[in-house]
């Protein structure tokens, strides 16, 4: 990479399929897909409505037919990311075919695999889309902040359920499952930022192995 030159992710067709979102002919969906790719690759502020329209092959007037503002389009993008995250990461990681604590370990494995694949396709680890936009927009746009807050709270639920099961099974000492799940997800977001900064997806897996030791120091062995 040349010093001082801005690196831009290029979300290819393959990356789009990894996200579970094939390109569609529907105009509204094309706008969502284009905004998703551009904002995830760069940032909310760095992407304008005209660029989104150009990528989608849509006239600007059509944009405002579907979305009153870039904020409204971004909320739709967040909803689409959440649907993918629920199904492809959380849903698979927390399937009950493993003991509850192993599901948490598997979450970090799946998250690392996704980030590694994105890096292979784009050259950069993009990080967590929710954490990315939270860092950028939480002090600037309350509607976006609230949506990301809701998404993150929703993501804590399978962690809480797994922890509660582990307590019931005697694999963990008595803990506040909800509070511990919140701490775990905060750790997830910190790991994602650190791994993104290092551009090393494998750090997500490596640091994930420490997660339960940090939030439950007296974890039974």
Where are these regions (language model features)?
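N-terminal intrinsically disordered/low-complexity leader segments
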Residues: 1-26, 221
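Hydrophobic alpha-helical bundle segments that form small-molecule/ligand-binding pockets
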Residues: 3, 140-144, 152-180, 216-221
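Helix-turn-helix
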Residues: 30, 38-80
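Hydrophobic alpha-helical connector segments
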Residues: 76, 90-126, 181-184
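Amphipathic alpha-helical packing segments from all-alpha helical-bundle domains
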Residues: 102-109, 125-127, 132, 142-167, ...
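Hydrophobic alpha-helical segments that form the core
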Residues: 126-132, 175-194, 210-213
């Amino acid at each position: 990479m040349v010093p001082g030159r801005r690196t831009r992710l290029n979300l290819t067709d393959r990356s789009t399929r990894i996200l579970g979102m094939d390109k569609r002919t529907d105009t509204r969906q094309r706008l969502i897909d284009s905004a998703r790719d551009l904002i995830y690759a760069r940032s909310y502020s760095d992407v304008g409505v005209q660029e989104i329209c150009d990528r989608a092959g849509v006239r600007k007037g059509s944009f405002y037919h579907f979305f009153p503002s870039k904020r409204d389009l971004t909320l739709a993008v967040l909803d689409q990311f959440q649907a993918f995250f629920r199904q492809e990461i959380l849903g698979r990681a927390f399937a009950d075919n493993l003991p509850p604590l192993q599901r948490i370990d598997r979450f970090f494995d799946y998250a690392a695999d996704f980030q590694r694949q994105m890096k292979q396709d784009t050259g950069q680890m993009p990080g967590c889309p929710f954490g990315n936009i939270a860092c950028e927009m939480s002090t600037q746009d309350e509607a976006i902040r609230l949506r990301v807050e809701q998404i993150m709270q929703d993501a804590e639920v399978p962690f809480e359920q797994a922890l509660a099961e582990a307590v019931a099974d005697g694999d963990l000492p008595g803990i506040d499952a909800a509070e511990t799940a919140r701490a775990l997800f905060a750790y997830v977001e910190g790991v994602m930022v650190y791994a993104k900064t290092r551009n090393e997806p494998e750090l997500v897996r490596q640091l994930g192995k420490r997660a339960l030791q940090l939030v439950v120091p007296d974890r039974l062995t």
